[in-house]
């Protein structure tokens, strides 16, 4: 977490803003459920009450933070038309951020993991991205495919001229020896969303949702499952809603006994 939220040194620095950022990290960056986020909120509030009892804090900084509804996340995949508007706008305004978004869309790598991906993790020859266990959510090494469109953009933007030890998307969304936080990605995305008058349900993480939907529809849910590094198809299905839910083609054409 220290790579994504500015660390505090003294306990009195634990304020509402820091606690809120931490809970956003749990919900958005780790892609946890609303229930998990709320459980962390309850735990953090109890911890702060203990700090008050011991005289380390004067008031509880978590009290003003609300519990959120535990239904479906208020996040949706892009519509095809909006995805094209998004692409055309960024082609003109910020091709480096467009590369980041395209990378997220095709690889399904989580934003928190993307901040730690280095150029050395990419194989152009094999069109693969290695996700080390040290940065992955499930603490296991992973390998995902790198789409032709992403490689072309990287070559056009001269990304591979940077040192292999550079983080792929650092300051300015360019290769850098210093990583940035997921909040940097999120804040810029939100500005673009506002400019294009997109709904609040479009979030940076929606790029992954959209990519999973589109790959599942094009190549099948099993392919999408493996690219997303999900343990089973049921996890992948959570990213598909309504008309985006897939069915096996075999179910449409097999000859039954009835």
Model-derived features: positions:
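C-terminal secondary-structure termini that scaffold catalytic or DNA-interacting sites
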Residues: 126, 156, 160-163, 171-176, ...
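C-terminal catalytic core of tyrosine-transesterase DNA break-rejoin enzymes
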Residues: 53, 102, 106, 112-113, ...
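C-terminal catalytic core of Y-nucleophile DNA break-rejoin enzymes
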Residues: 136-156, 165-189
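Basic, Lys/Arg- and aromatic-enriched nucleic-acid-binding interface segment
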Residues: 38-40, 53, 57-58, 62-111, ...
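Catalytic-site neighborhood detector that most strongly recognizes the C-terminal catalytic loop/helix
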Residues: 133-135, 228-253
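N-terminal core-binding DNA-recognition domain of tyrosine site-specific recombinases/integrases
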Residues: 1-49, 54-56, 72, 93, ...
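Short, polar N-cap/turn motifs at the start of nucleic acid-interacting alpha helices
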Residues: 121-126, 199-200, 220-238
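Conserved tyrosine-mediated DNA breakage-rejoining catalytic core shared by Y-recombinases
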Residues: 64, 116-159
């Amino acid at each position: 977490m220290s790579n994504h939220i500015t660390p505090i040194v003294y306990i009195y620095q634990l304020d509402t803003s820091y606690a809120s950022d931490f809970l956003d990290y749990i919900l958005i960056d780790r892609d946890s459920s609303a229930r998990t986020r709320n459980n962390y909120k309850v735990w953090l509030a109890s911890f702060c009450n203990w700090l008050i009892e011991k005289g380390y804090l004067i008031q509880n900084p978590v009290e003003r933070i609300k519990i959120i509804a535990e239904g479906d996340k208020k996040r949706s995949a892009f519509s095809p038309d909006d995805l094209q508007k998004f692409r055309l706008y960024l082609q003109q305004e910020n091709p480096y951020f467009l590369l980041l978004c395209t990378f997220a869309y095709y690889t399904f790598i989580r934003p928190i993991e993307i901040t730690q991906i280095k150029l050395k993790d990419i194989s152009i020859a094999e069109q693969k991205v290695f996700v080390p266990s040290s940065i992955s959510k499930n603490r296991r090494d992973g390998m995902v495919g790198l789409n032709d469109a992403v490689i072309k953009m990287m070559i056009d933007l001269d990304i591979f001229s940077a040192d292999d030890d550079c983080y792929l998307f650092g300051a300015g969304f360019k290769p850098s020896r210093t990583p940035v936080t997921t909040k940097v990605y999120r804040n810029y995305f939100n500005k673009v969303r506002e400019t294009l008058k997109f709904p609040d349900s479009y979030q940076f993480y929606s790029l992954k949702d959209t990519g999973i939907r589109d790959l599942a529809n094009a190549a099948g849910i099993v392919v999408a499952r493996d690219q997303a590094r999900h343990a089973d198809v049921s996890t992948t299905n959570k990213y598909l809603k309504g008309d985006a839910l897939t069915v096996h083609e075999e179910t449409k054409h097999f000859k039954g006994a009835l």
